[in-house]
Curated annotation (Swiss-Prot):
PANTHER family: FES CLUSTER ASSEMBLY PROTEIN SUF (PTHR30508), UPF0051 PROTEIN ABCI8, CHLOROPLASTIC-RELATED (PTHR30508:SF1). The gene is sufD. InterPro entries: Fe-S_cluster_assembly_SufBD (IPR055346), SUF_FeS_clus_asmbl_SufBD_core (IPR000825), SUF_FeS_clus_asmbl_SufBD_sf (IPR037284), SUF_FeS_clus_asmbl_SufD (IPR011542), SufBD_N (IPR045595). Belongs to the iron-sulfur cluster assembly SufBD family. Part of the SufBCD complex that contains SufB, SufC and SufD. Pfam families: SUFBD_core, SufBD_N. This is Iron-sulfur cluster assembly protein SufD. One of its GO terms (biological process) is iron-sulfur cluster assembly. It comes from the Bacteria. The SufBCD complex acts synergistically with SufE to stimulate the cysteine desulfurase activity of SufS. The SufBCD complex contributes to the assembly or repair of oxygen-labile iron-sulfur clusters under oxidative stress. May facilitate iron uptake from extracellular iron chelators under iron limitation. It comes from Bacillus subtilis (strain 168).
Length: 437
């Protein structure tokens, strides 16, 4: 197989992997077909970011063996800080590299028909349900080489299913711990909320090691029925040696359904992030709030897109990013209103603050409108720290580093304060504190 870089798995390996995990025939066949498709599909072409030489395929091992946790106390302090250890009623999934290490789901939620488990177990035990949605309504296998490779190599992730008329009152959490230098992660998260249901899902990606050249290919899909609501929070905190492709996509299928995203994109390595919400149903609502801090020499590209198909649909994008050192980033915000989506409203704001002469940021607001009776607006700004602000703070006896930190918090606060998940707010503040030192 020729992918510019040699891929370390082949068809025979995938057959063996699928059989080992007792996967249904549809998933095994999907893997094999996807690997073939990846041969000919092009790489994605993120706007203004050249990824030709990025490593998305070269990794030592597709999986490594880890042990399940005998207790959450066995986690490192850094990981335990993300979890409410004392809460005995928490709904939690912990994954160590690719290994499902801990799962807790209350009997009450089980009795209501809620399913929450790792993606490979879900494919085996709830085959028809997973097959119905897996890379169908959200991300398609053949979009480009990286989506095809993801479909072929999925080795982790979670499945969350909320039946009709069920409201999950407390957040569902998944923690994905990267602790091996040798392995790649192809994580797939699939969330389905049936009619008149609601759920909040929060995930953490965290590295406890810093490999030289790791590969992460992450896809999340959210599907909502009539009047269903999903709030999806994420804090990505992977180390500088990890090259990441992450694609989070929502499909608001049902009328008056809602998908909200609260994303803290804090990776230290090169990252391509796509976040698209398709508002198919009439009266649907999509909202994406994103906070980014880049540092070192990393290159990042963030594309946030809300596409309106349904009448009277509403879409809001709010992104603030801070670039330090020699980091560079592209922020693309796209509001697209398709023909027939009358009364739709598309609004967006993207702002980038650069803290050094070598830092680079670019904000590109884009509106694509194919309908007359709509409302749309955008705002964007890119700039450096105002020296007058720093001078004012320093003149009050505040050291320069502390003054810069206060300016950064002031810049990011309008987004952080608007995040709909309190736990994500607290985690983000902690990560921001570490990254802006």
């Amino acid at each position: 197989m020729t992918l510019g870089t040699k891929l370390s798995v082949d068809q025979e390996y995938l057959k063996s992997f699928s059989e080992k995990h007792q996967e249904p025939a549809w998933l095994k066949n999907l893997r094999l077909q996807a690997l073939e498709q990846a041969e000919d599909l092009p790489m994605p072409k993120p706007d203004k970011t050249k990824i030709t030489n990025w490593n998305f395929t070269n990794f030592a091992k597709h999986t490594v063996d880890n042990e399940p946790l005998s207790s959450l106390e066995d986690l490192t302090d850094e990981v335990k800080a993300l979890i409410d250890i004392e809460n005995e009623d928490k709904t939690l999934y912990v994954q160590r590299d690719q290994t499902p290490a801990h799962l807790s789901l209350s009997q009450e939620l089980k009795d209501k028909g809620v399913i929450f488990t790792d993606i490979l177990t879900a494919a085996r035990e709830h085959s028809d349900l997973v097959e119905k949605y897996f890379m169908k309504d959200g991300v398609k296998v053949d979009e480009h080489k990286l989506t095809a490779l993801h479909a072929a190599l999925v080795n982790g992730g979670a499945f969350l299913y909320v039946p009709k008329n069920v409201q999950v009152e407390t957040p569902v959490q998944a923690v994905y711990v990267h602790e091996s230098n040798d392995t790649a992660l192809f994580n797939h998260v699939l969330i389905v909320a049936e009619d008149h249901s609601s759920v909040t899902y929060v995930e953490n990606y965290i590295s406890t090691v810093n490999p030289k050249d790791a590969v992460f290919n992450i896809i999340s899909e959210v599907i909502t029925g009539d009047n269903a609501s999903v709030t999806y929070g994420a804090v990505d905190n992977l180390s500088s040696g990890v090259t990441t492709y992450v694609n989070r996509r929502g499909a608001a299928r049902g009328r008056d359904s809602k998908i909200e995203w609260a994303l803290g994109l804090m990776n230290d390595g090169d990252t391509i992030s796509e976040n698209t919400t398709n508002l198919y149903g009439d009266g649907t609502y999509g909202d994406t709030k994103t906070v980014v801090v880049g540092r070192g020499e990393q290159t990042e590209n963030f594309t946030t897109q809300i596409i309106h198909f349904g009448k009277a649909s509403e879409g809001y994008i709010l992104k603030h990013g801070v670039m330090k050192d020699s980091a560079s980033s592209i922020f693309n915000g796209i509001g697209k209103i398709e023909h027939g989506a009358s009364k739709a409203n598309a609004e967006q704001e993207s702002r980038v603050l650069m803290l050094s002469e070598k830092a680079r940021g670019d904000a590109n607001p884009i509106l694509l409108i194919d309908e007359d009776d709509v409302t749309a607006g955008h705002a964007a700004s890119v700039g450096r720290v105002d020296p007058i602000q720093l001078y004012y703070l320093m003149s009050r006896g505040i050291p320069k580093e502390e003054a810069e930190r206060l300016v950064i918090y002031g810049f990011l606060a309008p987004v952080v304060n608007e995040l709909p998940i309190e736990g994500v707010k607290k985690q983000l503040v902690s990560v921001i504190e570490r990254k802006v030192k």
